[in-house]
Structure formats: C-alpha cells, structure tokens
Amino acid sequence: MRVTDFSFELPESLIAHYPQPERSRCRLLSLEGPTGALTHGTFTDLLDKLNPGDLLVFNNTRVIPARLFGRKASGGKIEVLVERMLDDKRILAHIRASKAPKPGTELLLGDDESIHATMTARHGALFEVEFNDPRPVLDILNAIGHMPLPPYIDRPDEDADRELYQTVYSEKPGAVAAPTAGLHFDEPLLAALREKGVEMAFVTLHVGAGTFQPVRVDTIEDHIMHSEYAEVPQEVVDAVLAAKARGNRVIAVGTTSVRSLESAAQAAKSDLIEPFFGDTQIFIYPGYQYKVIDALITNFHLPESTLIMLVSAFAGYQHTMNAYKTAVEQKYRFFSYGDAMFITYNPQAISERP
C-alpha cells in the first residue's frame, strides 16, 4: 500500500486553531462501519449511541509543558522538545539548533535562561539532557516549559492551553501531545454517561512527539513506528473481559486507547487481553485484525498519517476516505482542536485494500 493512498485535500480554513468554547458542543460525524452510512450530529449524541454496560476506555495521560527555549552556553539558540522524562533529573528530547550539541554541552534554558542543564548523550535523533537543579524535572517543566501545541496550530501557546489542551480526567504527566478525542468530554457529559450505566476504564499512553512525524517512506509496510510507553492495568483487563462476557461493546476513546488495548491483546499469552506495561511500537493499517475494540471515538487526522491508516483498518478504506471527503464538504473542523467521529467496527475492513 502506498502512503499517497491516504491523502485527501484539506483547506487550511478547516484546521482548528482553538477549541470550541464548550468541550462537548463540537460536531460529531458518525460512521457505521459495516454499511458506510454517515450521520451528522453533536458530541452529546453519544448519550443515545452508547448502551448501559458499554465500556468506554480513556487514556488518562497528562500533557507536560514539554517545549523549552534557551541557548547553548556558547551562544547559539536552541529549542528543546521533551520526548519523555527518564527520571527526576534527566529527559530524552529532540533539540532544534543551528548545530547539534555535542555531549558535555552546557544549556541555559527558560525564557530568562535561568535553568542550567547539560547534554550528556545522544541516542539517534534524541538527546539525553540532565538538569543541574535541585527540583524534579516535572517541577522545572511546569515552571519554564511551554505547552507543545502541534505544528499545524500556527500560533504561540497561551496560558489557557495549559487546561484546554488537557482532558478533564488527565492524571499521569508524561505526554507531549493530548489524546485529543478525550478533549470533548466534560464533567456533565461524563456524569450523564455514568448515570445511564456506561462503564469507564483508564489506560495510560504517554503520547510522544513522534506522533507528529510524517511517514517518510512511499510504501506504508516499510514505515517504522515510533515507540511510546503504555500501561494497561489489571482493572482495565477485567473491565474489558466483563463487557465482552455480557455482550456489551468496548469503545476506545482515541487512537491512543486503541493502540494501548491492541498492544495488550497482542502481548497476551492465554486470554483475549492481559495487563501490559511497557513500550509499544504497534502500527495498525489495513489488513490488521482488531482483537478488542468494537467502536471508536476519534478526531479527524492528518492526510497520509498513521492515524488515518488506523481508522481505515477499523472502518474500511473506502468508508473512511468517503467520510473524510464528506467532512471536508460539510466543513467539519480538523485535527487536535477540531470535531470528532464515532465509528463502529467493519468486520470486512481486514480484507479491504486501497
């Protein structure tokens, strides 16, 4: 399959640069996987689409202020984007500079250049940086870091993004991008879903900066997926197995929840799904056999991205591309701060190719 098979025309005007004033008032395009039928509505329509006993699986990662500005002690400007926190003193990061720093390079970080750090090692495209500061890394990032808005949101981050670019249930700091399908859930909607009898469970996948990297090969089978840390604890496994046993659906909120659950299913030795704690490089594209999820809530993704490939593997290629064409025609808002889709599984998708 070719990467260009997953391309579509998107006017710049449809890229959302700010979220809706009210989280749950975004538009919702529902795609019936088996038939391809499309329905237009709003996000709160989920109350009608979900049944008592259905299980929603959320990603409770929390976005860290992962973008740092500063300079090398020798003078050159740098931009640091944290990929992951290694411990209380060290980070693994992408560094943008006119000349890549060498191990031992001293860095002065923060808008006032008050934080001292040292680049200690290089691991491929990533740099290991150690802070010379008594505070834990997370405290330093909260003090001097900027929210890492995606590259297609063409504006500086604002104070409001510290909350707007978080899900209301975010709990575990470590992501450099929000699991954006979850941004549409507010407390009233969550309460109404609970009242209806919808079950909820929480995985953790710390979204890395690699999620924004373009696919740089022509043939998608040649793509090497970036690695991200995921946790699927025992209580999630129990909730999934219980939902399946009673004939209810497992509904992933976002592609990161999909990748967490399917990673846990791939690693399972005896049951449908077993607890999973570790890095995952799972790459889901047409031909993949889904094992766990029955429905998916997700935003609209970039052309030629691994995420539109994941959706195509779930709903079927033709149904997915037709839904995106319709979304453009109907002027849905795209990407992280944009509108959402509710998709049910298409069992025929596994045998469909572009």
Curated annotation (Swiss-Prot):
Keywords: Cytoplasm, Queuosine biosynthesis, S-adenosyl-L-methionine, Transferase. Its EC number is 2.4.99.17. One of its GO terms (cellular component) is cytoplasm. GO terms for biological process: queuosine biosynthetic process; tRNA wobble guanine modification. InterPro entries: QueA, QueA_dom1, QueA_dom2, QueA_sf. GO terms for molecular function: S-adenosylmethionine:tRNA ribosyltransferase-isomerase activity. It catalyses: 7-aminomethyl-7-carbaguanosine(34) in tRNA + S-adenosyl-L-methionine = epoxyqueuosine(34) in tRNA + adenine + L-methionine + 2 H(+). Pathway: tRNA modification; tRNA-queuosine biosynthesis. It is found in: Cytoplasm. Monomer. Transfers and isomerizes the ribose moiety from AdoMet to the 7-aminomethyl group of 7-deazaguanine (preQ1-tRNA) to give epoxyqueuosine (oQ-tRNA). Belongs to the QueA family. HAMAP family: QueA. This is S-adenosylmethionine:tRNA ribosyltransferase-isomerase. The lineage of its organism: Bacteria, Pseudomonadati, Pseudomonadota, Gammaproteobacteria, Enterobacterales.
